[in-house]
């Protein structure tokens, strides 16, 4: 049923296309397609459709009709190449075994349908295409140029049997006769004197094409500017009523402006040496002769708008001017932190070490004074006797008490608690502690020590905010001051509220080594 419908459509289309072959008879088409490529009548119909297509389309492949079934394989190869060039969309005609594609009746009908549709489309495009402009006077472009030369030189029409050599010899002779009648420098010497070969002419043509493309862009830009400028004049209410008059005047002149130039290699051959003279159009002497009154009428005098670099004021600074940094109010060393601070080096067992930190009630901690018999400092005050929380004398030794928040702490939270010390049990004191990130150390002799000694050496270094310096490694032994060697004693180390606290217990008969 499907094949019958396809046959009917094919027969109607063949009649419309002007086919006059034998396959228009009843049953002839079905008999031909049933044999496929082995039928000479089928191959002749395909060859006729392809020949009509080649007239309208640029096809390289061609199909020849067969005279016998033995040529069917060659015919199918030709059809395969043609369909590949035409980008046939039917897979059954472009895939599979080439020698067996057109042996199927349905594929043969599909091939005829495809070729007929392509031919119909090509003819419709040809009819709807705009007709080519006929050249004035007839003939090719070269003929028109030669005809113009003959007319300009006043030559008669050459005979029909003249050769090209004779024709150009006649033109050369006529040119010499014409040049003899004018002054010697009337035409001038040519600008291009060197002979050129085919390779040179190709390069010259390429250069000319590149320059032509560049100037075409410039011409389009200028024409677009002109269109926009003229269009802007029509924006006013007064000009809107004159739109038709403006278009009637502007459009004829606008149509004469072509974006493509007409300069060719022929203009290079016709160029004379007078074109190589370079004239300065901006010099005063030239402008005196070339200036016209229209320039002043159009422009007139305009006010000076400035803009000269030497007259422009410098821009304001992007950043505000820097001011000298002002020092803050002087305060006592202490509080929290305080860096390294300073340290006093004393040569006696009185004050020594750092004055840094904060006392319980003051902003600084004066860790000094003489020991012996007066107890210790506790939260900024003196108390009689010693205690575990506040420190104090223990068997005659001075123990450290510290600040309540952030300094020496005798058993309360914050900073190194109770510092660390290692000194004479009964005659010297070495305290180490943290005060808000700074390290404090006080080394001194107590009463009962050797005062003839050198103070207690150096006080510990002011530490950086996490280390106790050399004087106290993490709250350990105190500084480089006087060290005490004990025999028969032991340390008890324990933590209280996040800090270190060292207490000496069980020191028996400590012996002091001094210089």
From Swiss-Prot:
Here the segments flagged for biased composition (Gly residues) are 382-394, 457-481
The molecular function terms of the Gene Ontology recorded here are: protein methyltransferase activity
User: Where are the compositionally biased (Low complexity) regions?
Assistant: 485-501
Q: Where is the signal peptide?
A: none
Compositionally biased tracts (Polar residues): 502-515
In this chain, the stretch annotated as Disordered covers: 297-410, 432-515
* Protein name, as recorded: Protein FAM98A
Name the source organism: Mus musculus
């Amino acid at each position: 049923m499907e094949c019958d419908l396809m046959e009917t459509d094919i027969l109607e289309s063949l009649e419309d296309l002007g086919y006059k072959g034998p396959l228009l008879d009843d049953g002839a088409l079905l008999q031909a397609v049933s044999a496929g490529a082995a039928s000479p009548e089928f191959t002749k119909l395909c060859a006729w459709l392809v020949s009509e297509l080649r007239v309208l389309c640029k096809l390289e492949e061609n199909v020849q009709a067969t005279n016998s079934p033995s040529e069917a394989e060659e015919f199918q190869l030709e059809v395969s190449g043609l369909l590949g060039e035409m980008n046939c969309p039917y897979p059954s005609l472009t895939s599979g075994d080439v020698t067996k594609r057109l042996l199927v009746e349905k594929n043969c009908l599909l091939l005829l349908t495809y070729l007929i549709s392509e031919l119909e489309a090509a003819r419709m495009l040809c009819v709807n295409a705009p007709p080519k402009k006929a050249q004035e006077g007839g003939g090719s472009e070269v003929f028109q140029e030669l005809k113009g030369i003959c007319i300009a030189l006043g030559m008669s029409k050459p005979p029909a049997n003249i050769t090209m050599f004779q024709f150009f010899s006649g033109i050369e002779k006529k040119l010499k006769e014409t040049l003899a009648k004018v002054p010697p420098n009337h035409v001038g010497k040519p600008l291009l004197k060197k002979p050129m070969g085919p390779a040179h002419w190709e390069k010259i043509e390429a250069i000319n094409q590149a320059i032509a493309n560049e100037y075409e862009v410039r011409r389009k830009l200028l024409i677009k500017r002109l269109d926009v400028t003229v269009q802007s004049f029509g924006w006013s209410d007064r000009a809107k009523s004159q739109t038709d008059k403006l278009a009637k005047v502007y459009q004829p002149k606008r149509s004469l402006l072509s974006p493509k130039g007409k300069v060719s290699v022929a203009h290079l051959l016709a160029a004379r040496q007078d074109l190589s003279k370079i004239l300065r159009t901006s010099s005063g002497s030239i402008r005196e002769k070339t200036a016209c009154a229209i320039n002043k009428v159009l422009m007139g005098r305009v006010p000076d708008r400035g803009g000269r670099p030497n007259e422009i004021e410098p821009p304001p600074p992007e950043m505000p001017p820097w001011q000298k940094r002002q020092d803050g109010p002087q305060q006592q060393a202490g509080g929290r932190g305080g860096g390294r601070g300073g340290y006093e080096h004393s040569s006696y067992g009185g004050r020594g070490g750092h004055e840094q930190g904060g006392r319980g009630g003051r902003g600084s901690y004066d860790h000094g004074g003489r020991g012996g018999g007066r107890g210790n400092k506790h939260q900024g005050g003196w108390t009689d006797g010693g205690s575990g929380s506040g420190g104090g004398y223990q068997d005659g030794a001075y123990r450290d008490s510290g600040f309540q928040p952030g300094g020496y702490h005798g058993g309360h939270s914050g900073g190194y608690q109770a510092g660390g010390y290692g000194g004479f049990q009964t005659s010297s004191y070495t305290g180490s502690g943290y005060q808000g990130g700074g390290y404090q150390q006080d080394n001194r002799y107590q009463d009962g020590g050797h005062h003839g000694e050198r103070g207690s050496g150096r006080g510990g270094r002011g530490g950086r905010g996490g280390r106790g310096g050399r004087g106290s490694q993490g709250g350990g032994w105190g500084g480089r001051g006087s060290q005490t060697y004990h025999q028969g004693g032991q340390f008890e180390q324990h933590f209280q509220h996040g800090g270190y606290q060292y207490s000496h217990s069980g020191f028996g008969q400590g012996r002091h080594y001094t210089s």
